[in-house]
Curated annotation (Swiss-Prot):
UniProt GO BP: DNA recombination; DNA repair; SOS response
Similarity comment: family membership: Belongs to the RecA family.
Listed SMART domains: AAA (SM00382)
Alphabetical keyword list: ATP-binding, Cytoplasm, DNA damage, DNA recombination, DNA repair, DNA-binding, Nucleotide-binding, SOS response
Annotated residues for binding of ATP: 67-74
Protein name (record): Protein RecA
GO CC term (a single one): cytosol
Protein function: Can catalyze the hydrolysis of ATP in the presence of single-stranded DNA, the ATP-dependent uptake of single-stranded DNA by duplex DNA, and the ATP-dependent hybridization of homologous single-stranded DNAs. It interacts with LexA causing its activation and leading to its autocatalytic cleavage.
């Protein structure tokens, strides 16, 4: 018993010293604190928010978005920027590909006047800028587009045909080691957009891999695999793509869930389309033949007409979204006045 008391006393002294040197909360017993609900940035698609399990992209974490060309990777990232800005956050876009279209970003709801944009000359410069911005503690979200375009300085200054094996992988590994703790401390989300490559000589399993080595796979809390599954048509005119996103890795909720949504050309993710799909799945919107109804009132015939109705009636769209998220446990239901929130019984 005396030995146990001595150990407890020594531990208490050590904990006090740690908190004195590194600040309160730098070490704690796991049972002392209640589980904190993970804050998230909405993606623009309620279906994807639900698949992520926390209502969007987790704050203070690294997210990798990868997939084939023109699958919707940058569109998802720009919608996240627009939603973060709508909540008053400051966002940055590291445009390593030098391909950002400000006009398209504006159509998606991005405030381009306040968006911080950098078009770096090489990979080292891009990641140093990103690291400095993160350590300022002022950012809500930073996007790096793309990992494949983070070319090391030595490769840019070298000759064509020179071998630079593993340079980019080492660069990414070092940068992510430095940034991970700073992102968590600042509550900043970092989105790395990545491209696909083919592994040569693979006989079994998928030959696809992402660029930049293995570090990003390890450090990412969420990895999203974005694929275009079909082309949307209005008559004979192509108006957009049906996109499927698989949550390939998720450290904050169960992984491997999938979400499908529409990306319309010039408009981005169709929020209304996701609300219709999820509303029908949850039983909040009723579908009878080609007619859709909500609260016993017809919304319209055909998905396109309902989409137009919800776009013109944002209050109805917001109400449906609230009900979907509440139904799926991602948003707490409003408790009427005079009702006990724990039991649901009326208080007298």
């Amino acid at each position: 018993m005396a030995a146990t008391a001595d150990r407890e006393k020594a531990l208490a002294t050590a904990l006090q010293q740690i908190e004195k040197q590194h600040g309160k909360g730098s070490i704690m017993r796991l049972g002392e604190q209640e589980t904190v609900k993970i804050a998230a940035i909405p993606t623009g698609s309620v279906a994807l928010d639900v698949a992520l399990g926390v209502g969007g992209l987790p704050r203070g974490r690294i997210v990798e978005i990868y997939g084939p060309e023109s699958s919707g990777k940058t569109t998802v990232a720009l919608h996240a920027i627009a939603n973060a800005q709508a909540e008053g956050g400051i966002c940055a876009f590291i445009d390593a590909e030098h391909a950002l279209d400000p006009e398209y970003a504006r159509k998606l709801g991005v405030d381009t006047d306040s968006l911080l944009v950098s078009q770096p000359d090489n990979g080292e410069q891009a990641l140093e800028i990103a690291d400095t911005l993160v350590r300022s503690g002022a950012l809500e979200l930073i996007v790096v587009d793309s990992v494949a375009a983070l070319t090391p300085k030595a490769e840019i200054e070298g000759e064509m045909g020179d071998s630079h094996v593993g340079l980019q992988a080492r660069l990414m590994s070092q940068a992510l080691r430095k940034m991970t703790g700073a992102l968590n401390a600042a509550g900043t989300t970092a989105i790395f957009i990545n491209q696909l490559r083919e592994k040569i000589g693979v006989m079994f399993g998928s030959p696809e891999t992402t660029t930049g080595g293995r570090a990003l796979k390890f450090y990412s809390s969420v990895r999203l695999d974005v694929r275009r599954v079909e082309t949307l048509k209005d008559g004979s005119e192509m108006v957009g793509n049906r996109t499927r996103v698989k949550v390939a890795k998720n450290k904050v909720a169960p992984p491997f869930k999938q979400a499908e949504f529409d990306i319309l050309y010039g408009q981005g993710i169709s929020r209304e389309g996701s609300l219709i799909d999820m509303g029908v799945d949850c039983g909040i919107i009723t579908k009878s033949g080609s007619w859709f109804s909500y609260n016993n009132e017809q919304l319209g015939q055909g998905k396109e007409n309902v989409r137009k109705f919800l776009r013109g009636n944002p209050d109805v769209a917001n109400e449906i979204e609230d009900k979907i998220l509440t139904h799926l446990g991602l948003r707490e239901a409003e408790v009427p006045e005079g009702v006990d929130p724990r039991t649901g019984e009326v208080e007298f």
